[in-house]
From Swiss-Prot:
GO cellular component, one term: nucleus
Segments of skewed composition (Polar residues): 116-126
Family under the similarity heading: Belongs to the RRG9 family.
Record protein name field: Required for respiratory growth protein 9, mitochondrial
Recorded name of the encoding gene: rrg9
Places the protein is found: Mitochondrion
Length: 366
């Protein structure tokens, strides 16, 4: 048998030089030993370049086909029947047709292939050089070519297409000239005109002549009127304390007919709307909020009754005890504690400095 490494090397060489896919056939010049084995069908060869195929088949046809002695007595050889022979019926005509599919590579055919390939490459290079030298002639020839008149199309083998590769992105520098020109104009304008915040604000504040503001809602009008009337906020002179508000709710819940809204408003000297809001609310403060509320209410009471005291109004007892108004009388003030060094119960009563008449008489009576 022939060496497989020599066969593989030869196949690779032919594939690279002639760009031909060879079938897996025997390339040895020596006749192989024929045995009873199944012969495989060789796939049809791909279409070759006209110049390459012509040289190849001319070289192949020049070589006489070798008919070995072993080809004739194939049918006469007897051997044990195999499983493959039972399924395949081979005849001498079919065997001859199959022999035509196999090819034998010789040094002469290799030389012919190499010469044809080099001549084809030289012709293509010379054609390209002519087109580069006279581009206007090439363009004219391309323009006047009628596709209906051309009967034969020359086939040129290009680079193999990689179907698994991703499509190439368009490079950045391949941009139309118009877009670059307009872009440069925009950049020049941006550089020429510096940024000014006043210009931007003026554009924002520009109002069309026919623009009319939308209609304002009722609560917006009321809020604007209150802000105009009380610029510092709502600070009434009379406010009900949390205890008074709790009492109003309790009285109205227990006696709704007797303590109605007008009656409560007259009793506490507030507006009926304030009484309605007090009765309507359901808010209950938290312990922390309640403590803060008491502190703020105490400070408010001191400031309010301080102003009343300046006007000559006598404040209530609670606020008088806190020092608002005239304050506490002298007799109600606590005396400072007296510090003594003697023990309690051991000190003798002090005798008055002045001696009365009775005391003098006691000294004289025995």
């Amino acid at each position: 048998m022939s060496c497989s490494c020599t066969k593989r090397t030869l196949q690779l060489f032919i594939r690279n030089v002639a760009q031909v896919e060879l079938a897996a056939s025997s390339t040895s010049t020596y006749p192989p030993q024929r045995t009873n084995f199944q012969r495989f069908n060789v796939p049809s060869l791909p279409s070759l370049h006209p110049s390459h195929s012509r040289a190849y088949w001319s070289a192949y046809s020049s070589e006489p086909r070798r008919d070995t002695v072993e080809d004739a007595p194939i049918e006469n050889q007897e051997g044990p029947p195999s499983a493959t022979e039972g399924h395949i019926n081979t005849t001498p005509e079919k065997i001859d047709d199959m022999d035509d599919l196999f090819m034998e590579i010789t040094p002469e055919s290799l030389d012919a292939l190499a010469a044809e390939t080099s001549s084809g490459l030289a012709n293509s290079q010379s054609r390209e050089s002519k087109e580069l030298k006279q581009p206007w002639q090439a363009e004219k020839s391309r323009k006047f070519i009628d596709p209906e008149e051309t009967t034969e199309e020359t086939w040129t083998q290009g680079e193999p297409i990689d179907i698994f590769s991703k499509p190439m992105k368009k490079p950045r520098w391949d941009k139309p000239v118009e877009s670059l020109r307009f872009r440069s104009i925009k950049i020049d304008n941006a550089v020429a005109v510096p940024y000014s915040p006043q210009a931007s604000t003026s554009k924002r504040n520009m109002v069309r002549d026919d623009w009319t503001p939308p209609d304002r809602k009722t609560w917006m009008e009321q809020k604007a009127a209150l802000k105009e009337k009380f610029p510092e906020g709502w600070k009434p002179m009379k406010k009900l304390s949390p205890e008074a508000q709790a009492g109003i709710r309790a009285l109205h819940a227990q006696y709704p007919e007797q303590y109605s809204t007008p009656a409560l408003a007259d009793r506490f000297q507030v507006s009926p709307e304030a009484i309605r809001r007090i009765l309507r609310t359901k808010w209950v403060p938290k312990p922390e909020e309640e403590a803060d509320r008491e502190r703020r209410w105490f400070q408010r009471g001191k400031s309010v009754w301080g102003r009343y005291a300046e006007l000559g109004v006598k404040p209530p007892k609670r606020w008088r005890e806190e020092g608002i108004g005239r304050g506490k009388p002298e007799w109600k003030k606590r005396a400072a504690p007296v510090l003594t060094t003697s023990r309690p119960g051991t000190s003798e009563p002090r005798r008055p400095e002045t001696i009365s008449l009775d005391d003098q008489m006691e000294d004289r009576i025995f």
